[in-house]
Amino acid sequence: MKYYSTNGNTPDVSLQTAVVKGLAADRGLFMPERIPLLPKAFFNNIGEMSLQDISYVVANTLFGDDIESATLKDIVYDTLNFDIPLKHVADNKYSLELFHGPTLAFKDVGARFMARLLGYFNKQQNGNGGMVNVLVATSGDTGSAVANGFLGVPGVRVFVLYPKGKVSLIQEAQFTTLGKNITAIEVDGTFDDCQALVKSAFMDEELNAHMMLTSANSINVARFLPQMFYYFYAYAQLLKQGKDVSNIVVSVPSGNFGNITAGLIGKRMGLPIKRFIAANNRNDIFFQYLNTGVYTPKPSVATIANAMDVGDPSNFARVLDLYKHSHEAICAEISGCTYTDEQIGETMAKTYKETGYLLDPHGAVAYRSLEEGLAENETGIFLETAHPAKFKSTVDAIIGEDIEIPAKLAAFMQGDKQTVEMGSGFASFKKFLMSV
């Protein structure tokens, strides 16, 4: 299958080129030329299938023309060696727990899949001699998921850019203590500054002639598309539990919009989801777009749901492309909401007190949207995107308890921090990359 640029000013490319390049030559994002429908027989049997089996069928439907089935199966099964359970929280509301992977965040799925796929393509393209340099900007969980997903992958170096002082200590420890083929770059600026540095690097001819660059942010098709796997698995678990699946609403904590875009593509492939909610913190750019029809990026605002502190979501271009730039069509399938830190904290405290279920700040945004916007005849699923312990100081203060840190999270805290400090100007970043 070919992949085209959302900007439409560059030739279509293969999956391998889309994955290795990350961003199209015209600065657009790659999209599959067609979105195939899954057969009805798949949905008839999905309730009896495992996460890995479901994910392989979905992956093979989308990527089967480009990767031999045995290799793809190995990649999928190796990626998803952990569970993604659907837990009942209250009434008709369910949490899809995406924090049971190695770094306890939803991005483990996309990052692990991409690491394995990129390693495979790099070997196909360059044998054992080529070096791919992965650039990734992070506002929190992306850095840890990508760094751990790619740790030790032959022929790949990873450079993680993150805003100084704007990620939690636990998140920071997950990508600054690894060493080996992982370099953490501490940028004196915002997440949007980090993202701008990455995009500028891709567009710099001299830099690209010097080294092979790609991105592991959700702008890369191999990062965001695999995230659709768990939407299908959520549906399967509802079926297995004998719940009503006729009117499913999925609320997605939304920052860079890769997660919700993957769900929207899953819906196009036949997944019976009635509608989506894009749940925002105070960074309400998409919410304002829904209300006005005008997309106006603005500087990001720091919140307690920091992984969603994005003022210009990259994947908005994909949402527009999916709906052929129709504001009306987008509003028909996606609603929005926006909450302050106070409202997020209030939801976390209230939910924990009433149900015993502990939300992280991002999941709380999505859960509150279901509390306020779910009809009686609808079944709501919200994505719980990270373990609450990743935001321990915030969560402890809100619920008034000292929550336990899982062992695999605590292990990251033992290492020594290793970072390269840098300003937000591109010249210094380019100079650094040219020297490595």
Q: Which stretches of residues belong to each language-model region?
A:
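PLP-dependent amino-acid enzyme catalytic core
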Residues: 1-436
